[in-house]
Amino acid sequence: MSDESASGSDPDLDPDVELEDAEEEEEEEEVAVEECDRDDEEDLLDDPSLEGMCGTEHAQLGEDGQQPPRCTSTTSSQSEPSEQLRRHQGKNLASEDPKKKRAQKPSHMRRNIRKLLREDQLEPVTKAAQQEELERRKRLEQQRKDYAAPIPTVPLEFLPEEIALRASDGPQLPPRVLAQEVICLDSSSGSEDEKSSRDEVIELSSGEEDTLHIVDSSESVSEDDEEEEKGGTHVNDVLNQRDALGRVLVNLNHPPEEENVFLAPQLARAVKPHQIGGIRFLYDNLVESLERFKTSSGFGCILAHSMGLGKTLQVISFIDVLFRHTPAKTVLAIVPVNTLQNWLAEFNMWLPPPEALPADNKPEEVQPRFFKVHILNDEHKTMASRAKVMADWVSEGGVLLMGYEMYRLLTLKKSFATGRPKKTKKRSHPVIIDLDEEDRQQEFRREFEKALCRPGPDVVICDEGHRIKNCQASTSQALKNIRSRRRVVLTGYPLQNNLIEYWCMVDFVRPDFLGTRQEFSNMFERPILNGQCIDSTPQDVRLMRYRSHVLHSLLEGFVQRRGHTVLKIHLPAKEENVILVRLSKIQRDLYTQFMDRFRDCGSSGWLGLNPLKAFCVCCKIWNHPDVLYEALQKESLANEQDLDVEELGSAGTSARCPPQGTKGKGEDSTLASSMGEATNSKFLQGVGFNPFQERGNNIVTYEWAKDLLTNYQTGVLENSPKMVLLFHLIEESVKLGDKILVFSQSLSTLALIEEFLGKREVPCPPGTEGQGAQKWVRNISYFRLDGSTPAFERERLINQFNDPSNLTTWLFLLSTRAGCLGVNLIGANRVVVFDASWNPCHDAQAVCRVYRYGQKKPCYIYRLVADYTLEKKIYDRQISKQGMSDRVVDDLNPMLNFTRKEVENLLHFVEKEPAPQVSLNVKGIKESVLQLACLKYPHLITKEPFEHESLLLNRKDHKLTKAEKKAAKKSYEEDKRTSVPYTRPSYAQYYPASDQSLTSIPAFSQRNWQPTLKGDEKPVASVRPVQSTPIPMMPRHVPLGGSVSSASSTNPSMNFPINYLQRAGVLVQKVVTTTDIVIPGLNSSTDVQARINAGESIHIIRGTKGTYIRTSDGRIFAVRATGKPKVPEDGRMAASGSQGPSCESTSNGRHSASSPKAPDPEGLARPVSPDSPEIISELQQYADVAAARESRQSSPSTNAALPGPPAQLMDSSAVPGTALGTEPRLGGHCLNSSLLVTGQPCGDRHPVLDLRGHKRKLATPPAAQESSRRRSRKGHLPAPVQPYEHGYPVSGGFAMPPVSLNHNLTTPFTSQAGENSLFMGSTPSYYQLSNLLADARLVFPVTTDPLVPAGPVSSSSTATSVTASNPSFMLNPSVPGILPSYSLPFSQPLLSEPRMFAPFPSPVLPSNLSRGMSIYPGYMSPHAGYPAGGLLRSQVPPFDSHEVAEVGFSSNDDEDKDDDVIEVTGK
């Protein structure tokens, strides 16, 4: 265990397996995955959900506000205009935040499904692929009718086992079934119902499914018939028989001009009925007929037979037929590297070369092969040796066997030239490049490409083809470069984690048949996932059953599925039990401490960012604390970082494998490999991995365990109940004379088992009682196999273990990944799966090492699962994934056992564990070893063991009737034909690094900050931007001289690292709210709104790329603002009285951070930030007048001008100098300026400005304010506001006269001394400030300045803060705006750049400009706080002509769809 993995793991996996899996584990970026196909996603998912159920995963294609899908449609209730608007908003969001995660709902909630594409909207290649398959099946059907094959009459010598098998298989099929197979090509025709002469009973159901049930009197008769149709073509084993002469005819129903194609005699004697069907299935898809093989490019197919059904034999038989009867010359077989030798041995056994046969061999008994089998394995280490093998294969023909990794290296240019990057020492001498060698390498590359890809072989065969689960992985890309369309995928588990992996595999053998990933996700993935869980709605369940059947029927022509039911009739019984194990005290303490740390850090630490490593650490805990203790002692090795962070960030789970020649890098490598299929996992998406996270956070640390393991005693078996039960199972099995296998993902766990074995004695098997006791000794009494075991050593160990005469070796320790493929261990009949794998197929493949042809004894499987831990959750997800596979691939109806929340909430932590049981009920346990374990160790088992398959029982009562199947297909066709096409831009999986400064805090170190979060807090990846109503929030008075850090850090309950953040360059400000703030949730009835109560202290955190509100209980909300200002019902527009940062400009009301800055020839001083000392100083000068303006607002005349509801401010208001509502697209760090001065250091010269809303009045205003109030009451009444329908979102405090750019803007402009400049003339109706903050002066009152001539106060709506300069399209410097009598269609701004509060005095504004210089006489002069209108020519920014075209209008119709929105991210 010297090579600890960087994730804190152990030498845990097999480098051999990792080498061949390296490219497979290169999962593509979530974004690419979503585009190319996974979307949600779910993404997932799905993870999860699922990894599989990620489903994920998959919100990219769905609209979260839509209605639940119905049985006949997956459309939403959104109207077309609504969808167009959302599409437009999606584009804006995508441009603003291309990495934003698309999934908005909590991962455990059901997804809504977009409308399906119309059939005519499908890609042309998709329609062509489906049409080709339809024509192929029609041709085959026509051949069956024209050249019907006779029913084989099987002689008795060929029938002994078949007769026995079928006798136990149930009732015989009716005679009419024996005629021939019939494939239904079109179910949309209504003629079938008319031709039916049978009576149909229409049953009106009042149950939860309000649909029409048609009960056909013949349905019950055809139940068995339906069973036979499930797996595709050639699955009726009654027809899959030898003829009277013992021959096997391959080309059934062939035209008379074609010859009969028979299997070789030795193969015909060996194949089983289901294998005959598989060979015929391969022939129909790849050859079809001898004539068409010469003229067509052929088709691909998937042979999806379960493990142990002899797929290798079927392929070898088909290859022999292919070479004998067709012009095919080359076949490429790409297989897992550790099965290469097995494939070669199978070829030599079933089709021996001529030289291997005796001289007196009779061809009618054994027919030798006439083609060569070439192999590329680890013996060919140089390019020259590989090129020689390749050249021999191309010239001589035959079969070439190679591993996946070898194929990837030889076909991808990037990997060929450089290989996997390796760390090299700095050379002290210059590097010499051999140009001749470079030329040779390039020549090799061209030859490889020609042989393998262009044109490539005639047929490609991919064993364990479920590796093609990611269309963006390099191996998948390399395989898709092959030009041959005759592609075969062999897999026992076509659907492992999620439907998208299934789609990737189908898309390889039949490109474009299921459409794009988006089309497939919409039509099948999300409807099927929505109905998978026990809390799905009845409509979800029904739609899921319908769509599962439709998908199964679509693929049955080229996907042949045969399950373990075939094995059950040939093999002894198999019993698979799950034992839920309790944690010991030290394990529970460690696990509790670990989960507490996770909940405290949320997604900010390495655990939240890298769930793989969290799983690895947990695996150390529940397997045995000694493993964790060993890792803690070697923590320096654990920090070597064996997971590629960049790869992990892009893929979600992909783990890099160590280069060849290095020892396996521990448990992380192992688990990462085993979890590599979790690309779509909602588990991974839900915790929100930040790809820009600092590298240090991705290093596993064990400091949290140091205290608990200070006085830990190693070598105590009882510290792990799992280990106690394991040794009980081993010893009791040996006593019964049974050999046993032990599978674990962790190499360090296998090493620990070896340590405990060395201290114990081998039990006495039957018949050896008199012999002396012996210790367990490796390679004598037990074997071990992992990825580091050489291929030749593997074969020796396996053969020796399976030898019946070997009575000394009773135990075989295997790593799950290395030992689950290409290993036949029928010498054992008991298996212990020590830890649950992420991918259910790995554990299932481990089981199939013993339960396969050749097994003579009953098999017993024991799965040990740590209860009340993450492992139990992973096991639950295995059941869900397997259930989905049964439903889609096998067309079964497994029971729904878990809610989606149970399945997807992997990090759920149960604090209270039930008390140990005194005894367990063992009446239902028949197996003696397990029964004894329950009697001996009831305190170590949480509940009675149960059968694994009991959770996957097929509910035959839920099977679709023929009428329902017909309805399912019709509804699918109708959905394709009638729904409106809709495409939505892709959203990236993760946020950009806007919160990098926050998440860079190492949360798992005792030396750093450990925030306190709520116990029930769960990480949430993102929340969909929602519409929100502005909510009032006024800052409370902060004591004079309080600084940001002191104000924020004086409250110990906050426990917030202010200094840490400030050193990182993050602005932190503490604010006390004076009114309740509701954080809007999603637009659905099930979401509960969060609330920030009045009087609560919150922190406003503004980094370089984002602004956040942190509440006192630790929740963090990200603030976003997009869209146009909202139009109130009364036609007025509310705007906050602040402005965006000075560095941002406005393009016709649209925020554009990239717009060119206006030149400042006079070098005007610009504020660095909105909260700069200059602005704060200016604000303090008006503290006296604030109360005066506030008091005056309470007069009746003032209130009359405020017809709207009380002022409401965006709940995102948090950081000074920003605005929501003034600029339709505002940056992430822009918040309302109402909090401008709160918490800022003010110095000693000026009192702190107390800014309050009209609900909080000063009890006794100062005398200065009283006098100001008396003066203000002499002002004029407000002028009525003129309606203005078409306007420009002018972000300024000045009225915009009629604009000549639009002929509709013809309202005459009249300037009256008493009119309010903000609401006069043709000001846009949606830009009136009175409704957003009531009267803007209540926030930042304006007073006369001694330097500026005062004018009469106009009204209660007098000028407030200027939000930004006029749009640049309105600032044409060629117009002489300072001429007294020259009429302009619009006013020029006072400043050439946005100022914080333009009404306040500025040295730029000359106080002695005459009123005659105004654009309109008297336009600006009557208003207090404004200088006379006019602007120096030099201050006008250059006219930006290209922005004129971006003018947009707003209407009241958009008020509920095109509003300022806040994106709230709860952490």
From Swiss-Prot:
Cross-link (Glycyl lysine isopeptide (Lys-Gly) (interchain with G-Cter in SUMO2)), chain numbering: K115, K127, K272, K665, K682, K759, K901, K1014, K1018
Domain of life: Eukaryota
UniProt protein name: Helicase ARIP4
Biased composition (Basic residues): 100-115
GO molecular function: ATP binding; ATP hydrolysis activity; ATP-dependent chromatin remodeler activity; DNA binding; helicase activity; transcription coregulator activity
UniProt note: domains: Leu-Xaa-Xaa-Leu-Leu (LXXLL) motifs are known to be important for the association with nuclear receptors.
Keyword tags: ATP-binding, DNA-binding, Helicase, Hydrolase, Isopeptide bond, Nucleotide-binding, Nucleus, Phosphoprotein, Repeat, Ubl conjugation
Compositional bias ranges of the Polar residues kind: 1136-1155
Family as reported in the entry's similarity comment: Belongs to the SNF2/RAD54 helicase family.
Motif DEAH box: where in chain: 463-466
Residue positions where Phosphoserine is found in the record: S1169, S1172
CDD domains hit by this protein: DEXHc_ARIP4, SF2_C_SNF
Domain Helicase ATP-binding: 292-512
Reaction(s) catalysed (UniProt annotation): ATP + H2O = ADP + phosphate + H(+)
Annotated region (Disordered), positions in chain: 1-150, 186-234, 649-673, 1120-1171, 1184-1221, 1247-1284, 1445-1467
